[in-house]
Swiss-Prot record:
Residues 58-80 are annotated as: Disordered. The gene is M. It comes from Influenza A virus (strain A/Chicken/Scotland/1959 H5N1). Residues 1-22 are virion surface. Coiled coil: none annotated. Signal peptide: none annotated. This is Matrix protein 2. It is found in: Virion membrane; Host apical cell membrane. Cytoplasmic tail plays an important role in virion assembly and morphogenesis.
Length: 97
């Protein structure tokens, strides 16, 4: 019987699963993966602003500055820092009607 068609049915002793081999390692592994997926999905919904802002500004290296004078490098760094400071905490919420 497929896992998708198995149903818990009420009996005299309470709720029981009609699946006789629920101790199968494949069923246990699928359950663990499902639970982990649910946890990660919830965390993503709660913290997506923090996660994606870190990925956008924290891990991305800027363009190569090889051959560029130091004064221009410093000006570029300052512009990038100002862009991060201005954007910090300001997100646009788009609501679809």
């Amino acid at each position: 019987m497929s896992l998708l068609t198995e149903v818990e049915t009420p009996t005299r002793n309470g709720w029981e699963c009609r699946c006789s081999d629920s101790s199968d390692p494949l069923v246990i592994a699928a359950s663990i993966i499902g639970i982990l997926h649910l946890i990660l999905w919830i965390l993503d919904c709660l913290f997506f602003k923090c996660i994606y802002r870190r990925l956008k500004y924290g891990l991305k290296g800027g363009p190569s500055t090889e051959g560029v004078p130091e004064s221009m490098r410093e000006e570029y760094r300052q512009e990038q820092q100002n862009a991060v400071d201005v954007d910090d905490g300001h997100f646009v919420n788009i609501e679809l009607e």
